[in-house]
């Protein structure tokens, strides 16, 4: 058993840490207050190779592994939760399905721009009546000769307003048991009949684009069908498993930022003639935060390691996502408490971290769904 990162993984972490400190963190407050999507930041991230860390160089990627990618997500998330969420979604949801399930032509055409950072991708799964019940998808794709005609609605889709392509899940038929067959299709965002709006006013991660997608007689070539048409449900479950690793890493990053801010404040703030860091009540909070953050980080790294070694990782990804997300909310809440009245003020940033962290318990599978996933893995 080896707990040391490789030299390559350490280099990635240090590179992203330096970039995030200089290029992302200074804009975090502005991004949150205005809700502006940090497009220029993503262009720089693309130039640096961050958008393609876990993909082979032949598709425009950096040839890294899942661990390196998780470390990168943590560092970006530590600097800005909004940017971290859009980064995680672009890679894990927008690009990864193309790599794992796409044909060679689909990879060259659609994955390469995403992995090289010249475009963003998105993943359209959630619907108004299909949230946790993802199998309840109502969007339909009807085969019509050499194309599919798609009709339906998607909601709460990350990055869609700025994406070049959206991978859309849709019902394409029924199996012999009468159950819906859910498939995935690659839909360029400039396709006629596709309307993308962003009507949401969110509590947190406000600079991460969240969109609604309306599909009205959207026609795409049959060649845009992604993977096995009868296994679309399993494909997006695998996609979500990978995405949960990145959300867990993002939660760790946000929590680490809250701890860093709390340590600095506790050393500086004086009450009763001494720094509040000298009081046991504050020390216990800091100790609990640090312990839980490190535990969550190890969970993330283990799940990523399993994925890199082609071993089952569904349960471990759910472990990491569940614990890290709930931990981040606790850590950020404690950070506000340590800051006292100042923590309730926007200028200190920790209240933003709490608002950002809360989404980690909801997006890409709620805490309740994670517990179901874990229980089913234990009982099967």
From Swiss-Prot:
Organism: Bacillus subtilis (strain 168)
Keyword terms, alphabetized: FAD, Flavoprotein, Oxidoreductase
Entries under Pfam families matching the protein: Acyl-CoA_dh_1 (PF00441), Acyl-CoA_dh_M (PF02770), Acyl-CoA_dh_N (PF02771)
Annotated gene: yngJ
GO molecular function: acyl-CoA dehydrogenase activity; flavin adenine dinucleotide binding
GO cellular component terms, A-Z: cytoplasm
SUPFAM superfamilies in the cross-refs: Acyl-CoA dehydrogenase C-terminal domain-like, Acyl-CoA dehydrogenase NM domain-like
Active site: 364
Name of the protein in its database record: Probable acyl-CoA dehydrogenase YngJ
Binding residues annotated for FAD, in chain numbering: 123-132, 156-158, 269, 337-341, 366-368
Family of this protein: Belongs to the acyl-CoA dehydrogenase family.
Annotated InterPro entries: Acyl-CoA_DH_CS (IPR006089), Acyl-CoA_Oxase/DH_mid-dom (IPR006091), Acyl-CoA_Oxase/DH_mid-dom_sf (IPR046373), AcylCo_DH-like_C (IPR036250), AcylCo_DH/oxidase_C (IPR009075), AcylCoA_DH/ox_N (IPR013786), AcylCoA_DH/ox_N_sf (IPR037069), AcylCoA_DH/oxidase_NM_dom_sf (IPR009100)
Record field: catalytic activity: a 2,3-saturated acyl-CoA + A = a 2,3-dehydroacyl-CoA + AH2
């Amino acid at each position: 058993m080896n707990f040391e990162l490789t030299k390559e993984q350490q280099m990635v972490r240090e590179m992203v840490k330096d970039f995030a400190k200089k290029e992302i963190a200074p804009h975090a407050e502005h991004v949150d207050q205005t809700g502006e999507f940090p497009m220029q930041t993503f262009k720089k991230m693309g130039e640096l190779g961050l958008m393609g860390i876990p993909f082979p160089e032949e598709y425009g990627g950096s040839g890294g592994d899942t661990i390196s990618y998780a470390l990168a997500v943590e560092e970006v998330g530590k600097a800005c939760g909004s940017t971290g969420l859009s980064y995680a979604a672009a890679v894990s949801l927008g690009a990864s399905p193309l790599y794992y399930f796409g044909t060679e032509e689909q990879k060259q055409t659609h994955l390469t721009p995403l992995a090289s950072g010249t475009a963003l991708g998105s993943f359209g799964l959630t619907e108004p009546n299909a949230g946790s019940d993802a199998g309840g998808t109502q969007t339909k794709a009807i085969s019509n000769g050499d194309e599919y005609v798609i009709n339906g609605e998607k909601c709460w889709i990350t990055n869609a307003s700025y994406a070049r392509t959206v991978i859309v899940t849709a019902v394409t038929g029924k199996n012999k048991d009468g159950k819906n067959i859910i498939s995935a299709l690659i839909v360029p965002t400039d396709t006629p009949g596709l309307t993308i709006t962003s009507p949401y006013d969110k509590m947190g991660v406000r600079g991460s684009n969240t969109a609604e997608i309306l599909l009205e007689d959207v026609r795409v070539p049959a060649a845009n069908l992604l993977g096995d048409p009868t296994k679309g449900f399993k494909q997006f479950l695998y996609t979500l498993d990978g995405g949960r690793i990145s959300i867990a890493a993002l939660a760790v990053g946000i929590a680490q930022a809250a701890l860093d801010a709390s340590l600095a404040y506790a050393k500086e703030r004086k009450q009763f003639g001494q720094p509040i860091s000298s009081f046991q009540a504050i020390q216990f909070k800091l100790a609990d935060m640090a312990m839980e953050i490190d535990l969550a980080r190890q969970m993330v790294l283990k799940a990523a390691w399993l994925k890199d070694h082609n071993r089952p990782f569904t349960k471990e990804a759910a472990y990491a996502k569940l614990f890290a997300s709930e931990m981040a909310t606790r850590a950020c809440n404690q950070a506000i408490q340590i800051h006292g009245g100042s923590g309730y003020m926007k200028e200190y940033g920790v209240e933003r971290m709490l608002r950002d962290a809360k989404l980690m318990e909801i997006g890409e599978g709620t805490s309740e769904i994670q517990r179901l996933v874990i229980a089913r893995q234990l009982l099967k």
